[in-house]
Amino acid sequence: MTQIVAYDGTEGWKISPFGGRKDPEKMSIDDAKSLLEDAEIDGPLINWKEKGSTVEYLGTEDVDGTPAHKLRVVRKNGDINYVFLDPDHFLEIRIVTQRMENGAQVENETDLGDYEKINGVYFPFSIEGGPKGVTDKQKIVFDKADANAPIDDTMFKFPAAPSK
């Protein structure tokens, strides 16, 4: 089974077979907003000023035995990311996100690891995340990554209804 989550520049949509859904569904505004931030491939720190964010260094904090550098990033939309950087390579190893979803404050934690260099860019091949404090999180492991590969924009469009 394959889960699909897409955004075409205007609206988000998904197919969630693990939740028993086989047909594409349009996302709520909050879900699409969350998807946009999660899809920001360069992360919250690259070009943070141009993105309208502010960044504050908060010192170091232990992340699973690593004394990580902790940064507080306040996004243009008011969301807050706490970004934890590995002290040796300055790669993101954890991001804690605080945002409003459906009128309630939520906090999610994402751990990144198993970095590999692809065309001069480091990609995390392991991403594990979910609500902060929950032990059963969703884990994504990548087999392959390409940098700057050509992609047909139509693959992001909401699928047409199947003909009957």
For every predicted segment, state its role:
Residues 1, 64-160:
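Gly/Pro-enriched, hydrophobic low-complexity segments
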Residues 8, 18-19, 42, 51, ...:
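Feature targets compositionally biased, intrinsically disordered low-complexity regions
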Residues 163-164:
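Short, solvent-exposed mixed-charge patches
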